[in-house]
Amino acid sequence: MVRLVPRAFAATVALLAAGFSPATASADPVLVFPGMEIRQDNHVCTLGYVDPALKIAFTAGHCRGGGAVTSRDYKVIGHLRAIRDNTPSGSTVATHELIADYEAIVLADDVTASNILPSGRALESRPGVVLHPGQAVCHFGVSTGETCGTVESVNNGWFTMSHGVLSEKGDSGGPVYLAPDGGPAQIVGIFNSVWGGFPAAVSWRSTSEQVHADLGVTPLA
């Protein structure tokens, strides 16, 4: 499923999502960052990536709700702009099946957008990064915190992880990233679900291509 909230979109920080006005934003500035807890209707998820320049944030598409996106303490941080979500409803998925699962959130004018993870490390976007089985990755979710392991398999727009990567309810949408010794982390996925007993994420490379097709921008930081 692909859904765009009907409103003209341009790559500027002045964009507002459909139905959003500055008056709906919280009077107190909110820091928006990858790894923070977000709420939409009755869904609790993790924010995956924040582009401070575009003032757009990303999480899993299946986290979507019908109204505003808020922080843990229900302060409005923005509104949904676009989603793709074809996450299978069963307990299994074939490796050749394409999984798309992202949500783009246009951030409110009065929030502070940051790309710093809870660990203090910057999270950068390099959409051209190609993953390989056995590669070391980490995942951050609001329920499990940061857990690290390796890529188990690379599939059609998504990949699975093992050897230490954990997930529980609330971790959906969280960032999966390369965490080299020293320097910034590089996002490589948005956490999706657990398939065949393995935690899984949609590829950031594929997601970035979908974002470009849907919104005409490429998340970079």
Curated annotation (Swiss-Prot):
Gene3D superfamilies according to UniProt: Trypsin-like serine proteases
- Source organism of this protein record: Mycobacterium tuberculosis (strain ATCC 25618 / H37Rv)
Keyword Ligase listed: no
Q: Which GO terms describe its cellular component?
A: extracellular region; peptidoglycan-based cell wall
Annotated protein name in UniProt: Uncharacterized protein Rv1815
Tell me the leader sequence span: 1-26
Induction of its expression: Positively regulated by alternative sigma factor SigD, probably directly.
Is Signal one of the keywords UniProt gives this record?
yes
Keywords recorded for this protein, A-Z: Signal
InterPro entries for the chain: Peptidase_S1_PA (IPR009003), Peptidase_S1_PA_chymotrypsin (IPR043504)
